[in-house]
Amino acid sequence: MCIRDRDGCMDMIELKKTVDKCSIEGKRIFAIVATLGTTVRGAIDPIDNISKFCNERNIWLHIDGSIGGIFSITNLSINRINNVHFANSITINPQKILGITKTSSLLIVSNTEILKNTFSTGLPYVSNENNFFNRGELGIQGSRPAEIIKLWLGLRFLGMRGIEDVLNSSIKRRIFFENNLDTYKYDLYSGPLHIISFLPKGMNKNESDSWTLNKRINLLKKNFMISRPLFKNRYYLRAVFGNYNTSESNINDLLKLLN
């Protein structure tokens, strides 16, 4: 674990300290995991700087793009989103925002030969003629159902214009909510994506934990699904604006209940 800065991103100074400490203690680090869209606020780590550090130390760079990775396939102007090509591997979950039926999760690697050398054992019942390679040996699972078909169909249905519309509108909904939530009443924690968390000002831990619990219950009764993540030993309320069908009037109704 690495300490994060005030914007919720990985702190490079703390990262270097942590890696150096592990080296002194004889602990071997085989990978550093950067996050493209943190769970609580949708923050994006400084992937380019982390990549340079990983190259210097010969450490594998993996990006957890479960939340924000899908944004990287678009031309949307989002800071740090276009640095995914620096990674050795990345996970992307199209099910989280594009509406692809579960489960739809991808592991993309820059060099598939590494997966082949790691997992392939050779199968006596599969022919090796004509340099044929069984792609089922690229992971721990020997076989998978045709889950890729629903992703392919979903992407074909949306097209690049549709994908960008879905993703861009999610950011606009978060911005609208953030701009209209009472900042005199709440502390806000967000990033460049579609996620925002908030907490009332001036409350101690017990007070805010009780408030978030009761407020979430009351909002659920009004058909608003707001999550309550634990972050830095306190509970927050978190709004995720990935649903394409969420209208401005829906958000205004939520704001009335909060403001």
Task: Identify the residue ranges that each predicted region occupies.
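Conserved PLP-enzyme active-site core in the AAT-like
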Residues: 4-114
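Active-site C-terminal subdomain of aminotransferase-like
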Residues: 82-181, 192
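Conserved PLP cofactor-binding pocket of PLP-dependent enzymes
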Residues: 191, 195, 221-238
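Short amphipathic alpha-helices in soluble, non-transmembrane regions
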Residues: 210-220, 252-259
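PLP-dependent enzyme catalytic core of the Aspartate aminotransferase-like
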Residues: 231-259
